[in-house]
Amino acid sequence: MARAGEGADLLKCSFCGKSQKQVKKLIAGPGVYICDECIDLCNEIIEEELAEATEIGLVDLPRPKEIFAHLEQYIIGQDSAKKSLSVAVYNHYKRIQARESGTGLGEDGVEIAKSNVLLIGPTGTGKTYLAQTLAKMLNVPFAIADATALTEAGYVGEDVENILLKLIQAADFDTKKAETGIIYIDEVDKIARKAENPSITRDVSGEGVQQALLKIIEGTQASVPPQGGRKHPHQEFIQIDTTNVLFIVAGAFAGLDDIIATRSRRRGVGFNAPLHDADEEDLFSQVRPEDLQKYGLIPEFIGRLPVVATVTKLDQEALVRILTEPKNALVRQYQRMFEIDGVELEFTDDAIESVADQALLRGTGARGLRAILEEVLMPVMFDVPGRDDVERVVITREVVLENVNPTLVPREAPSRRTPREKSA
């Protein structure tokens, strides 16, 4: 037993040797003692080792087919985009691990460049959700930014460095962790320059923002103000290297299909060669850098986004599947909420189809499904939790379209107990 020489009753830490008078707390074990300072040190060591263990390792990095299979569980359709993103994400993190292990440069000195992603498709088709699901699967920090809020330095609006601050915040200000995160920039089509030909007038929310984004997307050592907002002298900055940050930039690119169609016609056989009747999504899949440049993206910006993936509009069948099939399908979420109150929630097939039809009618796609369900279920979600006589709520087509009251199936005995009460 560790004891100090001053007196038989004075104990000391078996690890650092400090006496009980030199520390705040001394905890006894079978023949040993440990002080609060050594406990804190042990906790720091464990946290560091756990942080290293949670980093993506080359052995543990899921292969493209595994990433695709995971996306399949949560995202309906969009197979082409899921495949493109699965490959892009795998190659990106494989490149990071190769650099960290010293194998990034082969014997011939070839260095693998970063491949950021451009995601094209209509609103409400799952672009943001694709990126979120990938980041969650890989356990990396994830930040979403809106390109329309950005302006070039010196003008009212957000600096591009504020995007990096969001990523740092998502990583709990652990910059090392943030440096391998994913940033999703939405509405990037809105920062296309206003005219195809460069103008002498300032385009502070268009070409100027594209120029400002170039460096951080390509990879640079950026200085980020910890409080956000504009930079000013004499303030402290957080330094972050964006070399290994994966950027996924996305937009609806309304009108891009017309540019692609015109280019395809021009290269067809004959003066007025008719273009085959092609859907918008088919045209998007044929996009080329020259089309994006004509749309208003500058060549340098296009060059930083070598991987182009496209998502398609969702039809009624796809929206019905989104409502019912994924692991966290919206219908299942609401059924679970009612189940907590001891009530069964049932949707008829035509009710679900009607919800999908409403989303198509509003032009909101998958993004609007939750809002429609909230509108339909709000009255019953308000009323049923206060009643003990309801066993099941049935939502029909008429409830969705005609705003009639849902069918409330009474229970045999008015003694409902929630799952929490049953386990008590």
Swiss-Prot record:
Zn(2+) binds at C13, C16, C35, C38. GO terms for biological process: cell division; proteolysis involved in protein catabolic process. The gene is clpX. It comes from the Bacteria. ATP binds at P122, T123, G124, T125, G126, K127, T128, Y129. HAMAP family: ClpX (MF_00175). Component of the ClpX-ClpP complex. Forms a hexameric ring that, in the presence of ATP, binds to fourteen ClpP subunits assembled into a disk-like structure with a central cavity, resembling the structure of eukaryotic proteasomes. ATP-dependent specificity component of the Clp protease. It directs the protease to specific substrates. Can perform chaperone functions in the absence of ClpP. GO terms for cellular component: HslUV protease complex. SUPFAM superfamilies: Glucocorticoid receptor-like (DNA-binding domain), P-loop containing nucleoside triphosphate hydrolases. InterPro entries: AAA+_ATPase (IPR003593), ATP-dep_Clp_protease_ClpX (IPR050052), ATPase_AAA_core (IPR003959), Clp_ATPase_C (IPR019489), Clp_protease_ATP-bd_su_ClpX (IPR004487), ClpX_bact (IPR046425), P-loop_NTPase (IPR027417), Znf_CppX_C4 (IPR010603). Residues 1-54 form the ClpX-type ZB domain. Gene3D superfamilies: 1.10.8.60, ClpX chaperone, C4-type zinc finger domain, P-loop containing nucleotide triphosphate hydrolases. One of its GO terms (molecular function) is ATP-dependent protein folding chaperone. Belongs to the ClpX chaperone family. Keywords: ATP-binding, Chaperone, Metal-binding, Nucleotide-binding, Zinc. This is ATP-dependent Clp protease ATP-binding subunit ClpX.
